[in-house]
Swiss-Prot record:
It is found in: Cytoplasm. GO terms for biological process: L-histidine biosynthetic process. One of its GO terms (molecular function) is imidazoleglycerol-phosphate dehydratase activity. It comes from the Archaea. It catalyses: D-erythro-1-(imidazol-4-yl)glycerol 3-phosphate = 3-(imidazol-4-yl)-2-oxopropyl phosphate + H2O. The gene is hisB. HAMAP family: HisB. Belongs to the imidazoleglycerol-phosphate dehydratase family. Pathway: Amino-acid biosynthesis; L-histidine biosynthesis; L-histidine from 5-phospho-alpha-D-ribose 1-diphosphate: step 6/9. One of its GO terms (cellular component) is cytoplasm. Keywords: Amino-acid biosynthesis, Cytoplasm, Histidine biosynthesis, Lyase. Its EC number is 4.2.1.19. NCBIfam families: PRK13598.1 (NF010121). This is Imidazoleglycerol-phosphate dehydratase. It comes from Sulfolobus acidocaldarius (strain ATCC 33909 / DSM 639 / JCM 8929 / NBRC 15157 / NCIMB 11770).
């Protein structure tokens, strides 16, 4: 049985449509009005080994904030819902991703507690058409709405693109590993997540 979901979020600011299948690696389509964000989302979904379609319409064209935030909310909710009761999932995973000069640690716990800690040492305020502050916002919003405890820590790196791409690769790989069904029971001393 494949774990897949379609999710729609509509506000006066954006319309976000997401299809996500976390058990079958297939075609990935990403379309938002923020080009660098498209690159990061595609990277995340690719390294999750997923099949996915993300389509975002910006109804107000203020800036990149609402696009990033609403996408993170919707993707987080979709990931949480597709996991169901989380029975048998590995739950924990971490990766250390090198990308040229960059080295980034990403760790996740699918605990139901969406707390994030993101530590970058970046010198730029923007990359392409995306504000760096909205990368932080993506991770915190995704973490909160998915119920995934998330840590992203830049260990090394001077190139902003490399650091961010390594972060999204690491998140994708960690989410894939943590969501694999390996056990019969819920992996919690409490008996539920």
């Amino acid at each position: 049985m494949s774990r897949s979901i379609s999710k729609l979020r509509e506000t006066k600011e954006t319309k976000v449509e997401i299809f996500l299948d976390i058990d079958n690696k297939g075609e990935i389509e990403v379309s938002t009005p923020v080009n660098f964000f498209n690159h990061m989302l595609y990277t995340l979904l690719y390294y999750m080994n997923s099949t996915a379609k993300v389509n975002v319409v910006d109804r107000q064209n203020y800036d990149d904030h609402h696009v990033v935030e609403d996408t993170a909310i919707t993707l987080g909710q979709a990931f949480k819902e597709v996991l169901g009761d989380k029975k048998g999932i590995r739950r924990f995973a971490n990766t250390i991703i090198p990308m040229d000069d960059a080295l980034v640690l990403v760790a996740v716990d699918i605990s139901g507690r969406g707390v994030s800690n993101v530590e970058f040492k970046l010198k730029r305020n923007t990359i392409g058409d995306l504000a760096i502050e909205n990368i932080y916002h993506f991770f915190s919003s995704f973490s909160y709405h998915s119920g995934v405890n998330l840590h992203v820590i830049q260990l090394r790196g001077k190139n902003t693109h490399h650091v961010l791409e390594a972060s999204f690769k690491g998140l994708g790989m960690s989410l894939y590993e943590a969501s694999r069904i390996l056990f019969e029971e819920v992996r919690s001393l409490k008996g539920s997540l």
